[in-house]
Amino acid sequence: MGSTFFGRPNVVGSSPPSSSPTSSSSSPATRRGKKNGSEKPKQPQRGLGVAQLEKIRLHGEMSCNSFNSYNPSLYPQEDVRMQGGYSSIPSQSSAPYGFYPNMMMGVHRDQYDRATMSWNPSYGILESQHSLEPNITRHFLNEDPSSTTRRSKSLGSGIQHSGSSENQEVDLELRLSL
């Protein structure tokens, strides 16, 4: 009795409730329930807005700084900031923040090989590390350890060398001081 359905609702009531004429009054109620459910995500969720605004702000700064590389005389204070000193924070991949590692900001073509960009998530800034004289670094890496001991004695450091571990500490101090 009403087991086949060809497009016309069965009035007897054995058909599914969505096709009966009496269920049409309950369909706005279910729609109304869906409206209430869809309104909840429209309310701002805490914490997401700040992160999104920060991301937009950083993208805006990157756009300004990439323009800065074409006209370096427009923003001299930006050039000074980008040529800052060394940082002890290692380089990290910045792809999760929407930045690309090969994108250089405010760095001229002749400085391309000497600049390292790194993202520091704890401070929320993009840091640049410039090696102004890369030959000095290479010189220390290839240097004989006995010559560094002679240099530390000639500098008058006053440290007595009793073992190889102290020599390594002195070498680290010399590298950091330069």
Curated annotation (Swiss-Prot):
Keywords, ordered alphabetically: Repressor, Transcription, Transcription regulation
GO molecular function: DNA-binding transcription factor activity
Superkingdom classification of source: Eukaryota
Motif EAR: where in chain: 170-176
One GO BP: negative regulation of DNA-templated transcription
PANTHER family assigned: OS01G0212500 PROTEIN, PROTEIN SPEAR1
Role played: Adapter-like transcriptional repressor recruiting TPL/TPR corepressors to inhibit TCP transcription factors.
The name this protein goes by in its record: Protein SPEAR1
Protein species of origin: Arabidopsis thaliana
